[in-house]
A protein has these predicted regions:
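Terminus-proximal functional modules
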Residues: 378-379, 387-394, 408-411, 419-421, ...
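Generic cytosolic/nucleocytoplasmic N-terminal low-complexity/intrinsically disordered segments
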Residues: 1-2, 98
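Beta-propeller-forming repeat regions
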Residues: 19-365, 372, 403-407, 412, ...
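Sec-dependent N-terminal signal peptides of Gram-positive bacterial secreted proteins and lipoproteins
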Residues: 2-24
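Surface-exposed amphipathic alpha-helical segments
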Residues: 416-438
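Small/flexible residues
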Residues: 4-5, 255, 417
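Secretory pathway targeting signatures of secreted, lumenal, and periplasmic proteins
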Residues: 356-403
Length: 438
């Protein structure tokens, strides 16, 4: 059995405590007081008048809001309120809402929170009213709405995390809450607004664990059909795409891959087929692969495509091979290929090649030269080569190559080993348009 690729993501968290930094630490109360801006000093004074001086400000650990004082028009009246997060005597974190009257900040409401740190704060336009406040605590999510100078809790749940997207395309956002499960499945609750009320959809389950999701995007599944596309790593070096739709208050996991041979027998030859199913999953519609790529709109037609591998063995088997990739698009009745090529995930690009190469060409990876080489299967002759070169490296040694594309850090060179007229020849005019950076 071949070995799976092992891709390990490493996240570094930096903790600090100041008026312009984002994180809280366990030693926060022992450090010097933060340096406030003039406006923050006014807020701090207003807060002190209400709760005294024995409190510790709390800071969201990530997201766009990286201050203990956050400004937002909470009730939609055109004027910003301020929110402050704090704890007193190591109690749970509390939320204080302040409003500005004639240039002075005054506290108008205090709401209970939870124990532990604040991981993320978001403001979501869920309906015609003002935004709801979505707070991810250490192990729970809280959703709040500010009306009549009161911050009321409208949803609370233990969860792994949440994502915000306009999944149904109605111009308002839904909050997808990901809840862990002992059955290696993840429960998803969809929080949405309707008729001025906050509602919770019926639960659906997906294979993706929240921490393993590396790509998520909302877009069209096909014309007039909106969806949410999730790509995750379900085990070492094994990746899949799952699709969620949301209509009329109901969430659904879509199955769109009925067109392929699922290959139930390991000994059955499926050379050239797209494999979407394997192992013990027992369901159709899962794009299972060994290449870490996500859903894209490859042809810029406004409809999302899903990645699948074209391979001679089954996707449920471990593999260190480099496979051709097809991006498939759903047309309302079936999924059909619209893009064919290869993926170089280390250097962050896709490169389009003719579909006929899938059965007659092999791909070799050269770690020494950081290149992909395409060779004829029948004789091993080189056809085409792609180099990814750091812009800090000397470029002179690539004089025999064509600079086909570049990004902020790398130049991408190509070389054809066959002449014009050969069945494998790609014209220089097509090189640049064949790259998609991921």
């Amino acid at each position: 059995m071949k070995k799976f690729f092992v891709i390990v993501g490493i996240m570094a968290l930096v903790f600090a405590f100041s008026g312009c930094t984002a994180f809280e630490t366990d030693t926060e109360a022992l450090l010097s007081p933060p340096v406030f801006t003039e406006e923050q000093e006014k807020l701090n004074s207003a807060l002190t008048e209400v709760i005294g001086e024995d409190y510790v400000l709390k800071y969201p650990e990530n997201g766009n809001t990286n201050s203990a004082f956050i400004f937002e028009d909470l009730d939609g009246d055109g004027t910003e309120e301020a929110m402050a997060f704090y704890s007193v005597l190591d109690e749970s974190t509390r939320i204080n809402v302040l409003k500005n009257e004639n240039g002075e900040w005054i506290s108008v409401y205090t709401a209970p929170g939870f124990y532990g740190n604040i991981q993320k704060v978001d403001f979501v336009k869920i309906d015609e009213k003002g935004p709801v406040v979505v707070i991810k605590w250490e192990q729970e999510i809280g959703i709040y709405r500010y009306e009549n100078e009161k911050l009321e809790s409208v949803y609370r749940e233990t969860c792994e995390g949440f994502e915000v997207a306009d999944i149904d395309g109605n111009g308002f956002y839904e909050v997808a809450v990901f809840i862990g499960s002992p059955m290696r499945r993840t429960i998803v609750n969809m929080i949405y607004g309707e008729n001025g009320k906050i509602n919770v959809s019926e639960q659906i389950s997906i294979h993706a664990q929240y921490d393993s999701i590396y790509s998520k995007i909302s877009g069209l599944l096909f014309e007039d059909k909106h969806a949410y596309f999730i790509d995750s790593e379900i085990s070492d070096g094994v990746y899949l795409t799952e699709i969620i739709t949301f209509e009329n208050g109901k969430a659904k996991r879509e199955f769109v891959a009925d067109f392929v041979d699922t290959g139930d027998s390991k000994n059955e030859d499926s050379s050239g087929e797209i494999i979407v199913l394997g192992g013990n999953y027992g369901e159709r519609g899962i794009f299972l692969r060994n290449t870490k790529i996500g859903c894209l709109d490859t042809n810029a037609d406004g409809i999302m495509e899903m990645p699948a591998e074209v391979r001679k063995d089954y996707a449920r088997e471990a593999s260190e091979s480099i496979f051709f990739i097809q991006y498939v698009q759903h047309n309302g009745t079936e999924a059909v290929p619209v893009w064919n090529g290869i993926a170089n995930t280390e250097n962050g690009y896709l490169f389009e090649v003719p579909e006929k190469w899938n059965k007659t060409v092999e791909i070799e990876k050269s770690a020494a030269s950081n290149s992909f080489v395409f060779c004829e299967k029948k004789n091993g002759n080189k056809i085409f080569e792609i180099f990814a070169v750091s812009k800090n490296d000397y470029q002179d040694k690539y004089e025999d190559y064509i600079l086909a594309a570049e990004d902020e850090t790398k130049n991408y060179y190509v070389k054809s080993y066959v002449a014009e007229g050969n069945e494998y020849y790609i014209s220089p005019e097509k090189y640049t348009g064949s790259f998609i950076f991921i």
